[in-house]
């Protein structure tokens, strides 16, 4: 039986994903002592894991290097769809928010400048509102953009809001909820249908049980 390759997002989401996979009966013990390794093979099941950055999960899945990926909905919303989004894992929950300084007027008719790491999401949001805005893409700490006068407001993902508060920003609108999703390579789904759907069924059962608690 061909080993399923699962691409995981490094960092906090990785820990939540591994915990969920283990509850679903997936052997993740090979990842216990990671050190600097990025590829792991289960010794008891035909499964291996790849640890990569969030945006690279989609790349590995798209090109079939990974059969399955676990990645945040924020990454999926920003990229072109070249995969099947199979399951909301209900972990890594946060939301897209519009935030700015206390003197920001969201109802102003003046053309706004919006700083964000997610220009596609920002464009969609303001297009749906019928607003024409200028969008500046920032890769780093987007929170300082309105404080320094680079932008009128920002669009970013928010979990607790503590980083916004520390930088003197307020949330003006909660936009889209986000959570981790399980995505599958289109060719892999055809070739490994039984294995993949078995994994999905196991995960769905765990999610259902946790939701009922």
Swiss-Prot record:
Keywords of the record: Amino-acid biosynthesis, ATP-binding, Cytoplasm, Glycosyltransferase, Histidine biosynthesis, Nucleotide-binding, Transferase
Q: Which top class of enzyme applies to this chain? A: transferase
Q: Name any one Pfam family assigned in the record.
A: HisG
- Identify the Gene3D superfamilies for this entry: Periplasmic binding protein-like II
A GO CC term assigned to this protein in UniProt: cytoplasm
Q: What does the UniProt entry state concerning the protein's domains?
A: Lacks the C-terminal regulatory region which is replaced by HisZ.
Q: List the PANTHER family hit by this protein, alphabetically.
A: ATP PHOSPHORIBOSYLTRANSFERASE, ATP PHOSPHORIBOSYLTRANSFERASE ATP-PRTASE
What name has this protein been given in UniProt? ATP phosphoribosyltransferase
Record organism: Listeria monocytogenes serotype 4b (strain CLIP80459)
The root-end lineage is: Bacteria, Bacillati, Bacillota, Bacilli, Bacillales
